[in-house]
Amino acid sequence: LRPGGADLREMAMRPQAIPDEAIVLRVDQSAGIDLPAIYDITMEFSGASARGYQALSLIEDADQKEDTLYRTVSAVLGDHQLAESSVAFDVSSGIATIAARGLIGSPWDDGDARLELDVPFQSADSFSFEVDRSRPEIADIPVTVRGPVYYRRNIEWLLPEDGGEFRLLGATGINEVIGGTRLVSSTSLDPAKLQIAEEVQSLEWEVPASALPDIRRETLRMKRSLPRLRASREAKRRWEYAGAERSRLGPIADVYDMLVADAESDETGAYLYRFEFRYNTGDFAGALEDASAAIARDASADNYLRRASAAWQLDDLEQALADYEAAADIDPDYTLHTTRLETLALLGRTEEAVALVDENAFLFEDPKNEAMSRSYVLGFAGQADEGLDGLRDELAIEPDDAGLLNSLCWDSGIFDRVTEETLDVCTRAVEQANNSAGAIDSRALALYRLGRYEEALRDLDVVLAREPGQHASRYLRAAVKRALGREAEAREDLSVARHAAPGAAKLYEAWGLLEN
């Protein structure tokens, strides 16, 4: 004590020695990077936040406990499917531990035809310093640093051993102080495992407002240097799991089965997630079962469409048509679903398909869309010239419309009405559609009809390099390769296409592009 007291003194922040939050996350994509990932996460909390989980550990209401744990894990992973979870509190250490296991969708991006991963779930990626000091009256007020906090996170990402070489981009190490916060990260990549160890620790109570511009620049620079991965072109895609390779899907399928088994009697979510997984990996019979289970719980138009698409792939056209009709009865916007029209045509009911378009023309908000739909069904009905004339009439009004140009090119190709003038239309469609894969595919068909097989093949190679999941182009490329005498390569394309999208084969047979 001092006579007369003492002035205020600045109290320096003492960095915490024990993490408030320590997370160990394991993401298993050893089966393939284009598949859902199995996650295992352990989260340890200390201090005040741990006390809340102490109370949660004592709650007997399993649903309430699971909901809370789902939200806790979501704060790290975002959307996920929780299969198993637990919470425990150690009184002696004061540490709460949450453990969870489940599935996340594949976070790899294939937007430019190269699979890349901006590695998610990094603590540093969520660091920000967005503070408004634009108003003059508060411009000089110091900015409070979030804290005191101390986070530790370890991420282990398992990769396929036979998925080709993975390239690590970005910084392999970060060790800097930004805005009064210490950010440390180290990254390593083995052939089939990515490991990241992070720490985020506050060191100061506040920073001067004048430092904000530098802090924002440093934050942006740091985030742009965070590690990311690039896969090679040999990486297996989800539609390539056929034959013996399907055994690799087993661990993921087991988690989906667990989610379905634990679902409430009126819940559809678990069935729909499994439907998507099965459909995308070529298990259309399993997908149909899941869609049927979803319909039994929620007879929505979307669920009927799901089952219709599975039935279509299984060549059950009557079932597919019934489900498309059921979806349209619930939601009239689905009345003119393209695959419904195709199904009618393949069943030999082309007059019904034409009548359906004519009788429901009021559903088209734009006349050009009606012209495109009519041209398609008229072609199936043996009236292709009439349909193409309708497209030309619309093009006279909108000569640069990419959709109309592509429809004229495509319909001329599938119904064998291609001329040299058609090819000019196809090239304009490619130009107006900014070289879209769909327009290039249409031009390839026109080139094929003209016997210009090498040019058609070049176009199709471009399409499938950009959009490897556009399986209809594989059917067409198989036809082109056969015309060039490259039978083995044609069979390879057909094998992939028939596994991934067997339903499309019926159309290519109807158009004379594929043998029965």
Feature roles, as predicted:
Residues 1-263, 267-269, 276-279, 309:
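A sensor for short, sequence-defined functional sites
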Residues 262-263, 296-297, 329-330, 362-363, ...:
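Structural marker of alpha-solenoid helical repeat scaffolds
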Residues 269, 302, 335-336, 369, ...:
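Start-of-helix register in tetratricopeptide repeats
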Residues 273, 306, 339-340, 373, ...:
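Canonical tetratricopeptide repeat
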Residues 276, 309, 342, 376, ...:
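Residue-level recognition of tetratricopeptide repeat
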Residues 280, 313-314, 346-347, 380, ...:
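Register position in tetratricopeptide repeats
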Residues 487-516:
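Terminal, low-structured helical/coil segments at or just beyond the last alpha-helical repeat
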